[in-house]
Amino acid sequence: RQAVVERVAVRDLGLKGAMVDPNALGRPLGDPAFDPFWRAAADLGAPVILHPYLLEAVERFGVHYLHNLVGYPFETTLGAASLVLGGTLDRVPALTVVLVHGGGFFPYHVGRFDRGHQTRPEARRDGAQPPSTYLRRFYYDTLLQRSEALAYLAGIVGHDRVLLGSDHPFWLGDPEPLQRRTVTIAPR
C-alpha cells in the first residue's frame, strides 16, 4: 500500500523523493516486508532520506540531550546497517539512500561491521560482501560540525557521495554549512 502512495506522490504530485524514519515501528528497515517500498522508490528514481525521529528506549536518552546527540545518529546507523546486513541493497540495487548526520556512526565504525561480517555468522548472509563495500551505495550529508570528521567521511566514501546538509531549523544544525564544505571537501 505504501508503495502505491509513493507512486502517487512522485508521479502525480511531483515530489522528488521520500524521507523515512530508520525506526520503522520497531522493525528493521532491511526486513524484506519493506521491499515493495524500496523497489517503488528505485523504480521511480526517487531517493530516500533516512532521518531519525522516533527513538527506541527513549528513557535512556532522556538526559543531557542524549536523544539528539547520540540517539539520532544511532538510529541512522541502525537503518544503514539493516539495509546492508539485511540484504536490501542487494535485492534493490538501483535504490538511492541518503544518510543524515554524516551517516551516523556507520562510516566511522565500518571496520567493526566488517569484522562482525568476518567472524559472526548472524552478521553475514550467503554471498554478501563485507559492509565496507556498501559505503558508496549511500549518500551522506555534511552535518558533522567538525571539518576533520567531514574530511574523514569524504576520504572514505568519496567526495561525490557527500551532499550539503544543514539540519535547518533544528538546534544542532550547521549555521555555516557552505563554509565548512568549502574548507573541507572542495577540489584542490
Indicate residue ranges for each PLM-predicted region:
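Active-site gating/metal-coordination segments in enzymes
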Residues: R1-G86
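H/E-rich (His + Asp/Glu) clusters that bind or coordinate divalent metals
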Residues: Y65-L85, V92, T96, V100-R188
